């Protein structure tokens, strides 16, 4: 765990080292993934069966999960879990419903009609991890925006190691309106969604997090299908003053550290004594935390505490780090928030732990990582929509603007472009 002070002479190079810390998997899996995708593309269901048997020790007669099986598994969830999923779905849906954009249409001064129509994607694939990262909340966060956007076919793949699955994942799929579910994981699932098999119709876009193999598979199929992003390890940055309870902040830091040994948790504070209290609280919590092994590895190898002269000094540091999650645990969080340009999502005030956003705050928890918040945004309804523009010229409008189009086409040396306009202009003169 790194401790930095902006007053130290060596702060700048040490901070830049933190900014450039590459926490993604260092093993090159591109060749393995390329082979898996090629086999799935060429051999379809047979290849999917072989990889599922090899990696998940599971060989079903069909990977398609029936409505009866889904209902049977979902029924295993307690009433409390079902109610929590319903509440989360309600809040997520409400926020994303408000994102739906309006079509644009107008007639300009030349008499040309112009516009833009929003159109939903036809079919989308959602990858849901198994194992440690089997999260029903991710089902809601990926599927609900697609449903609200108007996607008609929402296909989910989820691995079932040894034939087992988290019932809450299937309950969440029911709540979110997923239309098809297949028990496939890994790069082979991405291949099946992208290329299709004898039993799986290919989709137009693939969203959802996964391990290094899934991330690389999404990278390789991009172009054949759309993708949301290449997800990296989780991140949280907490800006906190001395008025906070250090134990609260420690729990917040560990909430992301427990995701992955490569996750990163950073505290920025203007109080050195408070920083030491938080560090001590983290160490104390780790002694009894069930996820101690993962969280401790993350904290020790990638955690950081930065002590600044004042909280205003945190803003340029934060914008350079461009973290996935930012908590502003200060008296006037809106003041700092207005200056933040690079972050996935903000959590304002002392009573808004990031975990609320993970489950049922409303905004999406699929957020840019690995400093991609410099240029990317979290998952939203817009990820499941396309924009189609249109133009309509009548005779008078073409006569007003057409000759300029001919001039530009001739300037670019494209005579057929020029001719397609000029022939119409001549036709209008001859009328």
UniProtKB/Swiss-Prot annotation:
- The UniProt record gives the binding positions of Zn(2+) as 256, 259, 358, 417
Residues the record lists as binding NAD(+): 127, 188, 211
Please give a single GO biological process term from the UniProt record.
L-histidine biosynthetic process
Tagged with keyword Coiled coil: no
Q: What class of enzyme is it?
A: oxidoreductase
Catalysed reactions listed for this entry: L-histidinol + 2 NAD(+) + H2O = L-histidine + 2 NADH + 3 H(+)
Which terms are listed as keywords in the entry? Amino-acid biosynthesis, Histidine biosynthesis, Metal-binding, NAD, Oxidoreductase, Zinc
Instruction: Note the superkingdom of the native organism.
Output: Bacteria
| Biochemical pathway | Amino-acid biosynthesis; L-histidine biosynthesis; L-histidine from 5-phospho-alpha-D-ribose 1-diphosphate: step 9/9
Residues annotated to bind substrate: 234, 256, 259, 325, 358, 412, 417
This entry's Enzyme Commission designation comes to 1.1.1.23
Q: Which GO terms describe its cellular component?
A: cytosol
The cofactors named for this UniProt entry are: Zn(2+)
Q: Catalytic center at which residues?
A: 324 (proton acceptor), 325 (proton acceptor)
Q: How is the cofactor bound?
A: Binds 1 zinc ion per subunit.
Spell out the molecular function terms from Gene Ontology: histidinol dehydrogenase activity; NAD binding; zinc ion binding
Gene3D superfamilies linked to this entry:
1.20.5.1300, Nitrogenase molybdenum iron protein domain
Known role: Catalyzes the sequential NAD-dependent oxidations of L-histidinol to L-histidinaldehyde and then to L-histidine.
Q: Which family does it belong to?
A: Belongs to the histidinol dehydrogenase family.
Q: What is this protein called?
A: Histidinol dehydrogenase 1
């Amino acid at each position: 765990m790194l401790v930095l002070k902006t007053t130290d002479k060596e702060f700048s190079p040490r901070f830049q080292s933190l900014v450039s810390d590459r926490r993604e998997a260092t093993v090159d899996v591109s060749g393995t993934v390329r082979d898996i995708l090629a086999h799935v593309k060429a051999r379809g269901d047979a290849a999917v069966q072989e990889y599922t048997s090899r990696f998940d020790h599971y060989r079903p007669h069909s990977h398609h999960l029936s409505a009866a099986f889904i209902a049977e598994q979902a029924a295993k969830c307690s009433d409390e879990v079902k109610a929590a999923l319903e509440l989360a779905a309600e809040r997520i849906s409400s926020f994303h419903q408000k994102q739906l954009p309006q079509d644009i249409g107008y007639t300009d001064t030349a008499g040309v009609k112009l516009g833009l129509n929003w159109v939903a994607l036809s079919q989308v694939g959602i990858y849901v991890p198994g194992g440690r990262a089997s999260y029903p909340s991710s089902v809601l966060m990926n599927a609900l925006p697609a449903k609200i956007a108007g996607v008609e076919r929402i296909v989910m793949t989820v691995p079932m190691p040894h034939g087992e699955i988290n019932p809450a994942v299937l309950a969440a799929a029911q709540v979110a309106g997923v239309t098809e579910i297949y028990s496939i994981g890994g790069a082979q699932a991405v291949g099946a969604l992208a290329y299709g098999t004898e039993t799986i119709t290919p989709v137009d876009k693939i969203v959802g997090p996964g391990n290094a193999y899934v991330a690389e598979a999404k990278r390789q199929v991009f172009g054949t299908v759309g993708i949301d992003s290449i997800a990296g390890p989780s991140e949280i940055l907490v800006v906190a003053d001395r008025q906070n309870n250090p134990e609260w902040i420690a729990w917040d830091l560990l909430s992301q550290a427990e995701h992955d040994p490569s996750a990163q948790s950073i505290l920025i504070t203007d109080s050195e004594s408070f920083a030491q209290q938080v560090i001590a609280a983290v160490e104390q919590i780790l002694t009894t935390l069930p996820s101690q092994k993962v969280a401790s590895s993350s904290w020790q190898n990638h955690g950081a505490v930065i002590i600044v002269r004042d909280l205003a000094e945190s803003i340029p540091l934060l914008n350079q780090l461009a973290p996935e999650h930012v908590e502003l645990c200060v008296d006037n969080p809106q003041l700092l928030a207005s200056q933040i340009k690079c972050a996935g999502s903000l959590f304002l005030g002392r009573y808004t732990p990031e975990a609320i956003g993970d489950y049922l705050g409303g905004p999406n928890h699929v957020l840019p990582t690995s400093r991609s918040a410099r240029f990317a945004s979290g998952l939203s309804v817009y990820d499941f929509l396309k924009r189609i523009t249109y133009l309509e010229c009548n005779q008078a409008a073409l006569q007003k603007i057409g000759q300029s189009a001919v001039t530009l086409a001739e300037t670019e040396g494209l005579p057929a472009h020029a001719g397609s306009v000029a022939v119409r202009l001549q036709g209008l003169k001859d009328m």
